[in-house]
Structures are given as C-alpha cells and as structure tokens.
Amino acid sequence: MSNSLTSAGLPLEGITVVSLEQAVAAPIASRHLADLGARVIKVERIGEGDFARNYDAAVHGLASHFVWLNRNKESICVDLKSEQGREAIIDLIATADVFIQNFAPGAAERLGLGAEALRSDHPELIVVNMTGYGTAGPLKDRKAYDMLVQAETGLCSITGTPETATKTGVPASDIAAGLYALTSVQAALFRRERTGAGATIDVAMFDATVEWLGHPMYMQMYQDTQIKRMGLSHASIAPYDAYPTLDGQLLIGVQNDRGWTQLVTEVFGRPELADHPRFATNILRVQHRGEVDAMVAELTREFKTADLDDKLAQAGVPAAQLNDMKALLAHPQLEARDRWREVGTEAGPIRGVLPPMTFEDVEMRMDAVPALGQQTDAILGSLGRSAEQIESMRSSGIVQ
C-alpha cells in the first residue's frame, strides 16, 4: 500500500446508501460500504443522535465506538415523528440505491419506512432490515444488544475460563450481523445489475451468531459434547495455549501432527516425542492434554520469549505474542504495511487503520467522521428544500 494511491475508482462509487442506524451492527455495514466508495447518509435522531456518540469520550471528547464506525459518512438529523421530517427522509430514500435500518422491531414500519411501503414505489431499492432475532419466532419483538445475543445463542457458554463464562472482548454478534449485511448488499447490487430487481433482506444478529457457532453445534449434535470453556486453549487441538518462558509467555498452536513433529524435533530437540504412543496424533494429544501441556510448559521455560519465538518461526511452528492494545498500537506489522492514516473529526484529526480489504490500485476511503447533523442543510437543499424552509424546520425542532 502506498500513500500515493487515491480513492478514485473504488468499486461502489455512484452508489448511495441511506442508513437509519445506531450502535454497531448497521453502522459497521454502512461504514464498509462507504470504505468501498459508496455515499452513505446517516439518519440520526434529534438531540443526541446515534446513542453510540455518547458511549464514552475517549477520543478527544468523542466516543471510541462512534469514530470507529462512522467515518466516510454524512449526517442528517431529523425528527422522523414529524410529517415534514418523515417526508424529507422518504424523498431522500427515493434517491438511494440501498436503505439500511436497525431500529427497534416495528419502528420502521410505524414510520412508513418498511420495506413493503418503500419498494412499492421503488422496486429497484435494496432494503436491509437488521434485527436482533429476526422477523418471526418467540423472540422477534425483543430488543437485542450484543451481550444478550451472545448469551442467548450460547456463545458465552463456550467463551471464557472453566470458572467463568464471558462475552467476547469485541461485540461479535453485532459485527457478525454487520458483515453479513455488507455481503448481502454487495450480492444484491450485483444481482440488480443483471436483472434490475431490488431486494428485501433480513439480517438477524441471532442468525449471524449461530452461523459462527457451527463447530460447537456439530460437536453437540453428533457427539453430545458441550464445548468446554478453556481460556486460550482449543477444545479439539493440543498443544494450543499460552506457555511460560523465562521472561513471559508465548502462544503456541500446533494444528496437525506434522506441526507436533516440528515442535518436538526442531524446537525442543526431543525427537522421541514425535511418535510417542500417547502423543503421536492430535486425538491422542487431546486425550492426554494435561500431560502434553505440562511437558510443553516445562520445555518452553528453558527459553527467553524472543528466542523461543524466533526458533518456532524458523521451524514453521505457529506462535504469537500475547499482546495488549498498547503493544498493538506499536506493532511493527502495521507500520511495515503502511496501515495508519489520518481521519478528520470535529475535535481534530485522529489516527485510523485502513480497512482490511486492500486493492492494489486504489485505496479505501478514510474521510472524516461527521458531527451530528453536519450535512443536514446540504442534504435537504439537494432535495429541493429552500433555505427558508430549512430554517423553519429547524426552528420547529424538525431538523438539527
């Protein structure tokens, strides 16, 4: 990646997305669409806007979640319960290719912004409804937040230590739903290019999380085995954990029997362990996990962390440092791959990391995070509202 690349020619240039969004699931989907070149207009409520704006004040007074998920967007702040505000957003959606919403169940329909109503006038529109639990079933009307969905799906039951179930350190259910929404929009745009047809797409956080639970679900279905919470270990692989060194610890993950042979022969100098009757195959090593882990830990304690890391790399055995966020910020891999960019905000420039999709000839957008309602006037003006009409709407509390 080179700083000399520009964002001209991104795949979704010319696509307009209107997103009635809050929190994480819809914002991460729309932000990635914007990264890829789409124009994304974020519709926010009067007053506080997206409530994620107020999660914390860690980034020069702005919320860390919000600056992460909302660069490259425009913000229009409208009272959707008012007739004028609702009409303005309906007019805005009429100019769009994609409409995304992740408000509470039934809210979009009550506002006249349901898929059926919108697509009756605009059949080419792609509508994405993002919910917690889907549009049917006993939980369909429940509000859903990431932790609740992680718990309801059983993700928490396999995450954490033997003593304590935990949620993941990032909002996994939100992110999963957002990425499936992103994929579905791209697929729908591709289909529309061929057929002219729009789409109505439902993406549930529950379903997205269940999709990620395939391995533990199959273990339960066909072996009647509940995956145990094992911290950094892996239920089906050994050795796979953080092991102590002379000055710290290092993660080692042996994925197959060849890796085991490389570990004990090339790293530890113990070739007799490669074909040991209790350790020769992964199934055997999992059965004797306690003995394997104790033996590996005894051998890793003979090395300094950096020396062991180098030796594992030379032998082709997968290993990693157990870094924290401070170490990540200084990680040489980010620097070597030129991943850092500057992103504008109302509080001044901040650092941001490029999206993970890397095109060789064009750079993903890294434009500013909008202030609340920053583009309200410009967007309303583009919809034919005069300056006088906009000022009247503002004085009436309809826009901000």
Enumerate the predicted regions with their spans.
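N-terminal helix-loop segment corresponding to the beta1-alpha1 unit
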Residues: 1-194, 371, 377-400
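Terminal low-complexity tails and localization/encapsulation signals of metabolic enzymes
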Residues: 1-16, 228, 244, 327-400
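Glycine-rich beta-alpha junction loops
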Residues: 47, 132-134, 205-210, 247-249, ...
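Short Pro/Gly-enriched beta-strand edge/turn motifs at strand-loop
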Residues: 49-51, 221-227
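Conserved Rossmann-fold dehydrogenase catalytic segment
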Residues: 135, 162-170, 193-209, 228-235, ...
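Oxidoreductase and adenylate-handling cofactor-binding alpha/beta cores
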Residues: 178-199, 211-223, 265-270, 274
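Aromatic-enriched alpha-helical interface/lid elements that frame and gate functional surfaces
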Residues: 238-315, 319
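Conserved PLP cofactor-binding pocket of PLP-dependent enzymes
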Residues: 313-334
